[in-house]
Amino acid sequence: MATIALGIPTINQAELLQPLLERYSENWYGRHTYIIDNGNQKIDPVGSKQRIVKMSYNLGVAGSWNLLCRTIFGFGYSHIAILNDDIYWNKNADDIESYIEQNPADFYVGLGQWCCFVLPYETYEKVGMFDDKFVNAYFEDNDYEYRMKLLGLSVHKNEFFNPDEYKQSQSIRKDPSLNVNFESNKMRYIEKWGGFPREEKFTKPFEKIIAY
């Protein structure tokens, strides 16, 4: 039986996230919701199952995802839903669990970006942690998707996981410095896998092709 909890990293979108917590407290009744606050904002939990985890520094996207996974899987949940702080996904936890049971897969995501995805514990165990060497944001999702591909894991893409409200890149628009590592992250991805996303050449990280 699938059991799911919710995780959301945030850094500077408290004014968007706070009203959403009211709505999530209803949709996720009885399940834990963990917020990783990388920006020391004023965010208040709604209900007994919501937790705000204050960080003294910015973990970045991958680091926040890892902390959420360790925390939620540590409670014994079989799946974690991870959302951006600038979207709203209007799905009831019971309906999500039912969907997962009817559509078994190694990973679930919408038809667009990874602003809303569901990761099973078994997949996290097989693939491992998200690569937090991709600093702040960008390419940590491409990296994980390629690692799943190398292991032959199934990715279930469906509009069921599309957000109902989406304000793209609000955090970077508010603080452009969060995007300062984009180029270095891109170069690291190429060095790690031998090409851009979907143009990878390596089957092992940082594999070197030696010509004789």
Language-model regions, residue ranges each:
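Hydrophobic targeting segments
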Residues: A2-I8, Y24, H32-I35
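Short, well-formed alpha-helical segments that are part of the catalytic scaffolds
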Residues: Q13-N27
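A conserved acidic beta->alpha catalytic loop
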Residues: Y29, I35-P45, D86-Y88
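Glycine-rich, basic loop-to-helix element that forms the pyrophosphate-binding segment
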Residues: M55-I72
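Short beta-strand-to-loop acidic/aromatic patch adjacent to the donor-nucleotide binding site
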Residues: Y77-Y88
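Conserved donor-nucleotide/metal-binding helix-loop-beta segment in metal-dependent transferases, i.e.
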Residues: N92-G110
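Conserved nucleotide-sugar donor-binding
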Residues: C115-G128
